[in-house]
Amino acid sequence: MKKLMIIILAVLFLISCNHEYQGVPESYHKLLDIAIEQAGDNAEEIKKAISESPAEQKEGMAFLISYMPERDLTSLGADFLLENVEYAYRAREEFSWCKNLPDSIFFNEVLPYANTSEDRDPWRKDFYERFSLIVKDCENIVDAIYTINKPINTEVKVEYDTRRSRVDASPKQSMEEHMATCTGLSMILTDAFRSVGIPSRLAGTGMWTNMKGNHTWSEVWVDGEWM
């Protein structure tokens, strides 16, 4: 009888563990355990983000949380994460160039909610609503890239200006100040690309060879290559 009770308890434990991450690939389970522990007082928000994700978005949410900086684990709310993931998957469903991306590219270069150390503002829904209209008639990713890049300063009303309040300003901050330097402008462009399913990331140089300043720019992933 004692042995039977041990077996039953073990089975119940396994079922409860599986239920917590139901629909999430097993390869993420240990990573999520670590992330939830690191989240501390914010753990319930992280758990809520996982549990309330639709089935088709579970892996994307698990990926974000598994590799999230600790500062975000302890501060980001479930609603922020759920909205970010929802609109990333909307872009994947809507635009052919995003639908056909490998998961590794989608997870790393479309799904993220931030680039570097900028404030974690909820930009994705706003940018999706702005830029999906601009690229809705584009036939391919190259056309979409040029279609966004050309009018973006006018769309967000941000110009290059070294009087900006901080180098790593978030898109929201830059749009409120109507100014940014190369880093802030590149974050806006990268997030605009990501909002419509175009894989994008920041690139840069810490110092030019003539020792006269640095630079940041946006790269895009087209046909298997970074440009």
Residue ranges of model-derived segments:
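The N-terminal extracellular segments of secreted preproproteins, especially immediately downstream
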Residues: 12-16, 181
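Sec-dependent N-terminal signal peptides
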Residues: 4-13
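A generic structural signal for short, solvent-exposed coil/turn residues
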Residues: 9, 38-40, 192, 210
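Hydrophobic/aromatic-rich core segments of domains that either
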Residues: 139, 144, 150, 162-172, ...
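N-terminal accessory/pre-domain segments preceding catalytic cores
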Residues: 17-161, 174, 195, 222-227
